[in-house]
Amino acid sequence: MITIFEALERVRVIPVVTLERVEDAVPLARALITGGIRCMEVTFRTLVAAEAIAAIRQECADVLLGAGTVLTVEQAQQAQAAGAQFVVSPGFNPRVVAHCLGHGVPIIPGIASATEIERALEFGISVVKFFPAELLGGTAMMSALARPYTAVRFVPTGGIHLNNLAEYVAHPRVLACGGSWMVPAQSIAAGDFSQVTALSQQTLQIVGVM
């Protein structure tokens, strides 16, 4: 059986989803699947996150499903109980990291510096979220951080879109790229899930070239 990280590397992209309504969760997941992407990260930026994760887990069992913007141990517990298979956080919170590792939940903590990479390595973590990627200097900064830490893989997120995705995916130390360009909030709000499918297909065309 492959690990979560191996599965993410095969997918190459992680749609970062913020849902305002639980009823949008399953149609959105199905739109991504139709577009060829069987992975998504539901953020805890809204109160319906855990319920949305549970709905997707029940109706779309083959989706690789993560919980994002996990800031507290309580949210990590809610994510796991709802069926999330991995956790992503914007920063490095040692309590959240320790909880996830202690309960067998893969976690991708956010880092923005060499110091935070070293903290991750102290916990035995070698896959980190480079966030916010573009504001921190993009692939140039990521390359600079990668050089001293040869075992670390990155999930760059923040400011990535169709026009710069190829540059990130081509980077040898990138495991997968996270972003919301495939799942625009206005399309979800309007129930225009066909747009999500179209953007997913465009994304895979770019990833497939690499």
From Swiss-Prot:
Recorded hits in Pfam families, A to Z, give: Aldolase
* UniProt entry tagged with the keyword Lyase: yes
This entry's Enzyme Commission designation comes to 4.1.2.14
What is its pathway? Carbohydrate acid metabolism; 2-dehydro-3-deoxy-D-gluconate degradation; D-glyceraldehyde 3-phosphate and pyruvate from 2-dehydro-3-deoxy-D-gluconate: step 2/2
Query: What are the record keywords, sorted?
Result: Carbohydrate metabolism, Cytoplasm, Lyase, Schiff base
The molecular function terms in GO held by this entry are: (R,S)-4-hydroxy-2-oxoglutarate aldolase activity; 2-dehydro-3-deoxy-phosphogluconate aldolase activity
Q: Which reaction does it catalyse?
A: 2-dehydro-3-deoxy-6-phospho-D-gluconate = D-glyceraldehyde 3-phosphate + pyruvate
Q: Where is the active site?
A: 41, 129
What enzyme class is recorded for this protein?
lyase
Question: Where is it chiefly localized?
Answer: cytoplasm
The organism sits in which domain of life? Bacteria
So where does pyruvate get bound?
45, 69, 129
Q: Which SUPFAM superfamilies match?
A: Aldolase
Q: Name the InterPro entries on file.
A: Aldlse_KDPG_KHG, Aldolase_TIM, KDPG/KHG_AS_1, KDPG/KHG_AS_2
For the keyword GTP-binding, the answer is no
Q: Where in the chain is the site Plays a major role in determining the stereoselectivity?
A: 157
| UniProt similarity note | Belongs to the KHG/KDPG aldolase family.
What's the protein here called? 2-dehydro-3-deoxy-phosphogluconate aldolase
Organism whose genome encodes this protein: Treponema pallidum (strain Nichols)
Gene behind this chain? eda
